[in-house]
Amino acid sequence: MTDDFAQDGQLAKAIPGFKPREPQRQMAVAVTQAIEKGQPLVVEAGTGTGKTYAYLAPALRAKKKVIISTGSKALQDQLYSRDLPTVSKALKYTGNVALLKGRSNYLCLERLEQQALAGGDLPVQILSDVILLRSWSNQTVD
């Protein structure tokens, strides 16, 4: 795993401009050990350390379920849409990944149905919107 962070490692070979950093390698070792032992880990590292790759690479190499929690949706989107595909491709990762968000980010079908049933009490524009939303909710899978 730490070879991934070497000058000629998988990350350097696959990611243009990648430069190995000792603090990044040390963090990757700590993350690997925590995953192997099934122990929690809290890491504090400065800007530019390479924290994202330092936890993503060991998580992908672990062949175990790993949860990565972010402090904001923006960081979650960056991680899932940019960093994860980059590291996955570099490490030739073929496993599954999933993006999970809190329930406040999803439509509650039960509440939508309640609003649709209470249609007589709603202004016309809102009722129209509820009907469109209800139709849309039957077409989506996520």
Give the label of every model feature segment.
Residues 1-14, 65-142:
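A substrate-engagement module of RecA-like helicase motors
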Residues 1-42:
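Conserved pre-motif I regulatory segment
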Residues 18, 53-55, 106:
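Aromatic side chains
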Residues 21, 25, 47-53, 69, ...:
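Conserved structured core elements
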Residues 25, 57-60, 101:
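Residue-level recognition of well-ordered secondary-structure positions
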Residues 32-33, 52-65, 82-86:
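Walker A/P-loop NTP-binding motif
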Residues 36-55:
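Walker A/P-loop
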Residues 37-41, 62-67:
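Short, surface-exposed connector motifs at secondary-structure boundaries
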